Design a protein with these regions (language model features):
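Glycine-/charge-enriched secondary-structure boundary and capping motifs
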Residues: 38-43, 51-179
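Phosphate/diphosphate-binding glycine-rich loops and adjacent basic-rich segments that engage nucleotide
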Residues: 1-35, 162
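Short, contiguous, pocket-lining structural segments
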Residues: 9-20, 45-52, 73
Length: 179
């Protein structure tokens, strides 16, 4: 309780919800060849490499960071951070802006923000829970490893849920049940 939640920015969808991505591509006039505003193709954005964090985690541990929990944010989206065993509330105050790919998927599938953040990483790739006293040093080490990170939120006493304040979204523990 009281831990900071540090998010690392994602590089893309990380091979999750591929069926939904495929369905979205079929609805685009040019499919995977649809151009994004940065000049990349939709298909290239889908295939963005997944970041690997083994060296980063080792560096954090070597620098004395007291990591309490780590999770990737894939398949269940941001809801995945409540997979920790304890009954706690995860309050997200700050999030990365989703990549354009996610906005396109949302526009052609008509999914709500709640559906999108509950399915995709929406720009958040990895969550690291550390004591508040370690946040600054954690962010520094992450940046040294060439990743972007933010102090996204805090773990609080309460029922098992994730609250994404900037989007006014709340997920209860029941939303992690298999669909």
């Amino acid at each position: 309780m009281g831990d900071a939640i540090v998010f690392i920015q994602s590089s893309g969808p990380n091979a999750n919800a591929v069926s939904l991505i495929r369905a979205a591509a079929k609805k685009l006039k040019k499919g995977y060849l649809t151009k994004l505003s940065d000049g990349k193709l939709f298909g290239e954005a889908v295939l963005a490499k997944t970041n690997i964090y083994a060296r980063l985690v080792q560096d954090l541990l070597n620098e004395g960071i007291d990591i309490h929990y780590i999770t990737n944010i894939t398949g269940h989206g941001v809801r995945k951070i409540m997979r920790a065993k304890r009954e706690l509330t995860y309050v997200i105050e700050k999030i990365f802006k989703p990549q354009e790919l996610f906005k396109i998927i949302q526009s052609v599938t008509n999914l709500t923000d709640k559906d999108m953040y509950g399915t995709f990483n929406m720009g958040q790739d990895y969550a690291i829970f550390v004591p508040q006293k370690d946040v600054s040093k954690t962010l520094q080490i992450i940046r040294k490893n060439k990743f972007k990170a933010i102090n996204a939120g805090v773990v609080k006493k309460g029922g098992k849920q994730v609250i994404i304040k900037p989007k006014k979204i709340t997920y209860s523990s029941e939303t992690l049940d298999l669909r």
